[in-house]
């Protein structure tokens, strides 16, 4: 059975290679808006929407869709639209704990078998200076990432510790995904 990744994210593509050497990428057409849902519901809802969007384009295969959400005290931080928003997000994360939620939806066609789950990882940031934040924003790294940082890049310098799956923070909880797919026989 063919495997499809419903994602434009180069990080998710790289992570899925840890499980499968061959898969096809079909970018979903979904507006990733911050709804008035809690972070867990939002991550699940967006991953389901992505899977359903790709399911409408294929007849047979296994679809893997994911969405990652960063939240501080239940308040969702999406992808920053500009430097000001990136600054605000990084200032909010500075010296604090936050959670990273990745909702994953698996869909098998034509059987219409579906499974969704959310992986949560806690992340603690060191206190950040304005200079560190501005320098990081100047690197342009924050702009396509939930919460305005990439733990796999220069954003790693801000992380004091994590509790849970590192790859979840990058964008795809590969160990959990592997086990869920194995339960389905893949």
Swiss-Prot record:
Database matches in CDD domains: Maf
Cofactor: a divalent metal cation
Primary location: cytoplasm
Location within or outside the cell: Cytoplasm
Keyword set, alphabetical order: Cytoplasm, Hydrolase, Nucleotide metabolism
Residue numbers annotated as active site: 67 (proton acceptor)
Annotated site residues (Important for substrate specificity) in this chain: 11, 68, 152
Catalytic activities: dTTP + H2O = dTMP + diphosphate + H(+); UTP + H2O = UMP + diphosphate + H(+)
Positions of transmembrane segments: none
SUPFAM superfamilies from the UniProt entry: ITPase-like
MF-aspect GO terms: dTTP diphosphatase activity; UTP diphosphatase activity
Database matches in InterPro entries: ITPase-like_fam, Maf-like
GO biological process: nucleotide metabolic process
GO cellular component: a single term: cytoplasm
PANTHER family xref list: BIFUNCTIONAL DTTP/UTP PYROPHOSPHATASE/METHYLTRANSFERASE PROTEIN-RELATED (PTHR43213), BIFUNCTIONAL DTTP_UTP PYROPHOSPHATASE_METHYLTRANSFERASE PROTEIN-RELATED (PTHR43213:SF5)
Main function: Nucleoside triphosphate pyrophosphatase that hydrolyzes dTTP and UTP. May have a dual role in cell division arrest and in preventing the incorporation of modified nucleotides into cellular nucleic acids.
Similarity annotation: Belongs to the Maf family. YhdE subfamily.
Protein name stated in the entry: dTTP/UTP pyrophosphatase
Organism: Carboxydothermus hydrogenoformans (strain ATCC BAA-161 / DSM 6008 / Z-2901)
């Amino acid at each position: 059975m063919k495997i499809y990744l419903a994602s434009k994210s180069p990080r998710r593509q790289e992570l899925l290679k840890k499980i499968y050497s061959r898969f096809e990428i079909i970018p979903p057409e979904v507006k990733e808006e911050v709804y008035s849902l809690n972070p867990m519901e939002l991550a699940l809802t967006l991953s389901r929407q992505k899977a359903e969007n790709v399911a409408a384009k294929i007849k047979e295969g296994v679809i893997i869709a994911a969405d990652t959400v960063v939240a501080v005290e239940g308040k969702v931080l999406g992808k920053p639209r500009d430097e000001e928003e990136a600054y605000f997000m990084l200032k909010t994360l500075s010296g604090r704990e936050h959670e990273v939620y990745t909702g994953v939806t698996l869909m098998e066609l034509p059987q219409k078998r579906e499974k969704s789950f959310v992986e949560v990882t806690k992340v603690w940031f060191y206190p950040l200076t304005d200079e560190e934040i501005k320098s990081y924003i100047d690197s342009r790294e924050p702009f396509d990432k939930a919460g305005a940082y990439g733990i796999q890049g220069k954003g790693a310098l801000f992380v004091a510790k994590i509790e849970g799956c590192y790859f979840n923070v990058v964008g795809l909880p590969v160990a959990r995904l592997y086990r869920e797919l194995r339960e389905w026989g893949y």
